[in-house]
Amino acid sequence: MVHPLIPQLESLARPLAARLGYELVQMVFHTNQYPPVLRVDIRPLDPEQETSHADCEAMSQALEVELDRVDLIPGHYVLEVSSPGISNLLISDRDFVVFKGFAVEVTVDPPYKGKAVWSGHLLGRDEEKVALSLKGRRVQLPRASVQRVVLSGAETE
């Protein structure tokens, strides 16, 4: 479940990241640890560049100033800024563009047409649906029902 502060924190961090030349990939607030950990994953807007330690440091310093200014998080916490690394999980719009045509596994809840897991080749994603090719047949899954999309690495066509 997404922590209730995440939408506010993302709305603060996303434009800051963009000004610095980064994409905010994901933000998670781990409150089951003491002190809690706010983890922020970034990557350069330029797809040819890798995320460096200096990138993470620059974003961390800038975000720390903003977080202190708005004082959204009560008490002590740890801010961690890092690269998302290589992940099979597709999250951002950029992921869905980069991995178009790749084999994916999509988990939906509630099940769509009686199935909770769909495997096929990614055709794309928009505001309303995630589109897959299943043996040449286009299937459009309601985006609101999509729980996760992962690269499967398996041939499905």
UniProtKB/Swiss-Prot annotation:
The keyword Cytoplasm applies. Keywords: Cytoplasm, Ribosome biogenesis. One of its GO terms (cellular component) is cytosol. One of its GO terms (biological process) is ribosomal small subunit assembly. Transmembrane segments: none annotated. InterPro entries: Ribosome_maturation_RimP (IPR003728), RimP_C_sf (IPR036847), RimP_N (IPR028989), RimP_N_sf (IPR035956). It is found in: Cytoplasm. This is Ribosome maturation factor RimP. It comes from Synechococcus sp. (strain JA-3-3Ab) (Cyanobacteria bacterium Yellowstone A-Prime). The gene is rimP.
